[in-house]
Amino acid sequence: MSEKCKKDDWVEIHYVVLEARERTGDIPEDTRKVPLECWIKGWAEKEGTVGEEVTIRTPANRYVKGTLTRINPEYTHTFGPCASELSAIGQELRATLKEGK
């Protein structure tokens, strides 16, 4: 993996939204002790190196500045394991709708 990105490369940045001292008192104490952080993906507006501050354009066309953390990051979220109880619903619904025509 390259440590440098070019303009328009898909990248991930990190920035601190709120420092620990700026956080509200209405959250659990252990949460209040750490900063609120954000990792966000988008296209680099100019070339940069991991660890440098860069600006990105997000898929929603927002411009966000932060520290470059990764170049060409993958998506790591999932919808979890398959719920076998739900796997037949699509076919059952199609059959029910077809009967109604």
From Swiss-Prot:
Query: EC number(s) for this protein?
Result: 2.3.1.263
- Tell me the enzyme class: transferase
**Record's catalysed reaction(s):** D-alanine + acetyl-CoA = (2R)-2-amino-4-oxopentanoate + CoA
Check the record and name the InterPro entries matching this protein.
OrtA
Say if the entry is tagged with keyword Transferase.
Answer: yes
Q: Does the keyword Ribonucleoprotein apply?
A: no
Q: Which GO terms describe its biological process?
A: ornithine metabolic process
- Which molecular function GO terms apply here? transferase activity
Alphabetically sorted, this entry's keywords are: Transferase
Cystines in this chain: none
Q: What does the function comment of this entry state?
A: Involved in the ornithine fermentation pathway. Catalyzes the thiolytic cleavage of 2-amino-4-ketopentanoate (AKP) with coenzyme A (CoA) to form acetyl-CoA and alanine. It is strictly specific for AKP.
Q: Which family does it belong to?
A: Belongs to the OrtA family.
This protein's assembly is summarised as: Heterodimer with OrtB.
Q: What is the protein's name according to its record? A: 2-amino-4-ketopentanoate thiolase alpha subunit
